[in-house]
Each structure stands twice: as structure tokens, then as C-alpha cells.
Swiss-Prot record:
Coiled coil: none annotated. It comes from the Eukaryota. It comes from Perymeniopsis ovalifolia. The keyword Ubl conjugation does not apply. Its EC number is 7.1.1.-. It is a peripheral membrane protein. GO terms for cellular component: chloroplast thylakoid membrane. This is NAD(P)H-quinone oxidoreductase subunit I, chloroplastic. [4Fe-4S] cluster 1 binds at C64, C67, C70, C114. Signal peptide: none annotated. It catalyses: a plastoquinone + NADH + (n+1) H(+)(in) = a plastoquinol + NAD(+) + n H(+)(out); a plastoquinone + NADPH + (n+1) H(+)(in) = a plastoquinol + NADP(+) + n H(+)(out). It is an enzyme of class 7 (translocase). Belongs to the complex I 23 kDa subunit family.
Length: 166
């Protein structure tokens, strides 16, 4: 008779323990219910990128002196710089500048080490295409200024600032 009573006690303790675990899980679920949503509806809502965001590279053709520092500091030797030496003034003249964003790792070394600041990072990150050859941008495509997300009236922008708890 005693083994039956102890088994019944163990069953009761296990039932209480299981109910407590379920209650703890339910309390965690309820604590998450009053939080703001983490996800956004992407094509219609966009997050405002941070100031140091490394997006598409913007290139200013007139500032470039064809020194090829960007090619030397690039970990994958990506920028293609074509230039011609002008013998009468003994300076390089830039003919063509291109970057293939299908290969670029967006490290920002080219922007950081450029002596004339002709390269800069933009907030543009939508570079997807159906053909990978379209990701090879020449100096004309690199010189195009991106449309700011804030200026686009069709998109609702969401400021992503972390909450500071005090």
C-alpha cells in the first residue's frame, strides 16, 4: 500500500512542476506581447541606415588623379583604373574607372585611403539584378547620386534606435 501512495505523491509533484513550467513559458509569452514588432514590411517600409553604413560606392570623376591607391588597398584588387600618361604635362589622365559590385565586399578601404576623397559610401543597398554583368558599374553609373530614402514619399521610413533602459 505504501508504494502506491508514494507513486501518487510523485505524480502530484510532477503535475505541479509541469504546470509551473507551462506557467513560466506563458508569462514569457505575455511579456513579449506588448513589445513593438521587430520586422518591417520591406518594400513599403525601410529602415533609415546609420551614418557609417557601407553601401554602394559613389565616384567623382573630376577629383580622381588615377593614383591607384584604391586598387592597392583593396583586398581583392577590384577597382579597374584605366589611365593614360600625358607627356606634355607629365600627369596621368583618367580614362575609365569601374567597380564590379558582384565581387565587392564593401569593406570601405578604397574610400578610407583615397587621397582626393573622390570615393564615398552611400546609403544605397538595393543592387540586385537578374544578370550579374549589370553589377559592373563604370564611372557614369558610379557617379550617379542615390535617391535618399527619406526623400522618397512612397516609402514609410522607420528610425531604428535602440531603447535605453534606465
Amino acid at each position: 500500500m505504501f508504494p502506491m501512495v508514494t507513486e501518487f505523491m510523485n505524480y502530484g509533484q510532477q503535475t505541479i512542476r509541469a504546470a509551473r513550467y507551462i506557467g513560466q513559458g506563458f508569462m514569457i509569452t505575455l511579456s513579449h506581447a506588448n513589445r513593438l514588432p521587430v520586422t518591417i514590411q520591406y518594400p513599403y517600409e525601410k529602415l533609415i541606415t546609420s551614418e557609417r553604413f557601407r553601401g554602394r560606392i559613389h565616384f567623382e570623376f573630376d577629383k580622381c588623379i588615377a593614383c591607384e591607391v584604391c586598387v592597392r588597398v583593396c583586398p581583392i584588387d577590384l577597382p579597374v583604373v584605366d589611365w593614360k600618361l600625358e607627356t606634355d604635362i607629365r600627369k596621368k589622365r583618367l580614362l575609365n574607372y569601374s567597380i564590379d559590385f558582384g565581387i565587392c565586399i564593401f569593406c570601405g578601404h578604397c574610400v578610407e585611403y583615397c587621397p582626393t576623397n573622390c570615393l564615398s559610401m552611400t546609403e544605397e543597398y538595393e543592387l540586385s539584378t537578374y544578370d550579374r554583368h549589370e553589377l559592373n558599374y563604370n564611372q557614369i553609373a558610379l557617379g550617379r547620386l542615390p535617391m535618399s530614402i527619406i526623400d522618397d514619399y512612397t516609402i514609410r521610413t522607420i528610425l531604428n534606435l535602440p531603447e535605453i533602459k534606465t
